[in-house]
Regions:
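Functional-site microenvironments in short loops/helix caps that host divalent-cation chemistry
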Residues: 66, 72, 107-110, 115, ...
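Short N-terminal segments immediately surrounding and downstream of signal-peptide cleavage
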Residues: 13-27
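Classical Sec-dependent N-terminal signal peptides that target proteins to the secretory pathway
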Residues: 1-7
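Long amphipathic alpha-helical scaffold segments
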Residues: 40-48
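A short glycine-rich, aromatic-capped structural motif
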Residues: 53-107, 119-122
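Boundary at the C-terminal end of the N-terminal hydrophobic targeting segment
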Residues: 9-11
């Protein structure tokens, strides 16, 4: 199973995490300039460490407000659903974020800003529960209707075939086009949809 995988040295791994933390620190510092409402809403756990705090601030900075509305969802757009307003992250959860919050990286190939893989719904639930425990904020997974509504662009939808474009290559990585493999790609590298959501 490990054939063809190069494991990084400890020094390389430390440099990788340092670059990631520096990036988080730079981007998370922006959130500190927002009104103190957000900071007041946070109730940091006494067990939280500095890196976890930075990651949670980074996640919050990348939350996108999705205004609620009525949409026709489902494969044939024939299932009308009322969706309340909510927030959703503009990116998939990265391996870095998962590692800092959960203390492990279950992914097959460890790559810093790639989406976490080898996790199921229960693992994802544990991740959101841990975010809530550490921050005091009510993190959760989106409901299926919320996810589809956001992927389609919410009230800003232009009714593209795919989430953000009629050309799948602009917005998605797909197996047939990329050497017939199941390799994940770095988050946020394709065009976002109408709400600014990637991947």
């Amino acid at each position: 199973l490990l054939q063809g995988i190069a494991l990084s040295s400890r020094a390389q791994e430390q440099q990788m995490w340092q670059r990631y933390h520096d990036k988080c620190r730079r981007e998370a510092s922006i959130i500190d300039t927002l009104p103190s409402k957000l900071e007041k809403a946070l109730h940091w756990s006494p067990t939280i460490n500095k890196e976890q705090k930075e990651v949670i601030r980074y996640i919050l900075w990348n939350m996108v407000y999705v205004e609620g509305g009525t949409a026709n969802l489902g494969d044939n757009n024939n299932y009308p659903v009322d969706v309340a307003s909510f927030f959703i992250n503009r990116y998939e959860v990265s391996q870095d974020e998962w590692y800092v919050i959960m203390g492990e990286n279950p992914s097959n190939q460890h790559r810093r800003n790639y989406p976490v893989d080898q996790v199921n719904w229960f693992n994802a639930q544990r991740f959101t529960q841990k975010l809530s425990q550490l921050s005091g904020l009510p993190f959760r997974l989106p409901f299926e209707a919320e996810w589809e509504y956001a992927a389609r662009g919410g009230l800003k939808t232009k009714n593209f075939i795919y989430a953000g474009s009629n050309n799948a290559e602009q917005v998605a990585w797909f197996r047939e086009k990329y050497y017939n493999t199941y390799v994940s790609k770095e988050t946020g590298t394709k065009k976002p949809n109408e709400l600014g959501l990637y991947d």
